[in-house]
Amino acid sequence: MFVRPESGEQGPETLAPASGAEIQRFPVPAVEPVPAPGADSPPGTALELEEAPEPSCRCPGTAQDQPSEELPDFMAPPVEPPASALELKVWLELEVAERGGQHSSSQQLPHCSQSWAQWKLWRQRPGFAIWAPLPHWRGTSLIQQSSSPAAEGPAATAAGAVCLPAGGAGEQEKEPVSRGSSRSSCSQRRPPPPGMEVCPQLGIWAICP
């Protein structure tokens, strides 16, 4: 049996509209005004737009932390080509010649009265021996190239060679001293024969009348 409710009572289905006092119980969030273009923005907004500072220490393993394998041209070490055998040979010859010149100039020996030009003419006379230096690593320091078939018996020294007229073996003096040996010291060298002087510039014994 269905009973109709009275007009004064409201059923659960019917909801009365909320009054203004009940609406004001819940606060409504305030809406901030949007600034017009060109106007100064509030300081809070400006701080939000600033970029965040980069961290001082970066995360390990990034590509920026790993050094580059290719160095710039100004940082790369210069690559020197290997010296050839000819360059080493020339360097050794210059080094030995320089040390020999310093050693001979340090000795207080009489100077030859002949000049280099006179010596060249003198040693080209027939009957005299011409001496040409050999590299020091071949065992001998000088070799005899005779300008006369009668010249025999080489006399080679490290500091110089005895150059005498070609003749008997008794007229020639020999000074077999090799560079680097114990006999090449100044105290053990024999004095020049009579009628000859030591020329430090030429490194030989020459006849100086």
From Swiss-Prot:
Compositionally biased region (Low complexity): 178-189
Region described as Disordered: 1-80, 164-197
Top-level taxonomic group: Eukaryota
Name recorded for this polypeptide: Putative uncharacterized protein CDRT15P3
